[in-house]
Amino acid sequence: VLFGIPYFGLSFVAQALVARGYESLGIALSAFAALAIFYLLGVARFRALRYRLSRTRWRGIRGGSDTAGFLFGLSYMWKTAVGWIPAGLLLPWSMTSLWNERWSKMSFGPYAFEADAEAGNVFARYLLFYLTPFVLFAGGIIMAGMGMLAGYGVGGEEGRALGGMIGIFALVPFFYFGLGLIAVAFFAKFYREVVGATRWRDLNFTFTASTLDWVKLLVVDALLVVFTFGIGLVFLSYRHWKFF
């Protein structure tokens, strides 16, 4: 509500300006609205973590941050943009850098957190996820060609068309499930890296969930929602909190 209403309000004003002939002003206002939402997303991520720490108590001691997160919003903007500029290849750096910056501004009691996660430790998993669509696309072409040849040998021209379609459709499940599994493998490695690189004074944190653990979590989430006709959504936050 806080983001949506102002954004759609500015978008409506921008469209009205364009309709009245003020194209440049309307485009500028639309760009400003998009950048404002982008900035506020970064601030919101910072404040969400600060809020959770402020509600975490241990023997009367609680966490938080001395900063409001406004500068982090700017860091979120430029680091995310830089991560996407070279065809998305710097996204692991962007994600680890933002994690380090966000946690390094947090504290629990009188002691600050420290985080020094390195993107190089997760880049191999990310590169696997990044290149998989291209490999699957090439595999789809090969399978379609093989299906066309097999179909042509059985049913001529009609068989060739049918064989090509079968070859392509046979690759669709591998594309969705394979790409999804690799994405889960990347995030499993990412969280093991960033949590393991986070410290609080002399206390080092670890996160040992494997890719299989993540798959089990997501599959059970889906089954819980489907077989309870959506009622299970209310239990997902508890499951995720327990998982982490």
What are these regions (language model features)?
Residues 36-40, 84-89, 172-186, 224-236:
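Alpha-helical membrane-embedded segments
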Residues 45-53, 92-112, 182-202, 237-244:
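Juxtamembrane interface at the ends
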Residues 86, 90-107, 127, 132-151, ...:
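Hydrophobic alpha-helical segments embedded in or immediately adjacent to the lipid bilayer
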Residues 7-37, 136-183, 237, 241-244:
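Membrane-helix interface segments in multi-pass membrane proteins
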Residues 1-5, 61-83, 111-138, 190-231:
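Interfacial aromatic "cap" segments that immediately flank transmembrane helices
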Residues 1-105:
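Transmembrane-helix bundle segments that line or gate the permeation/cavity pathway
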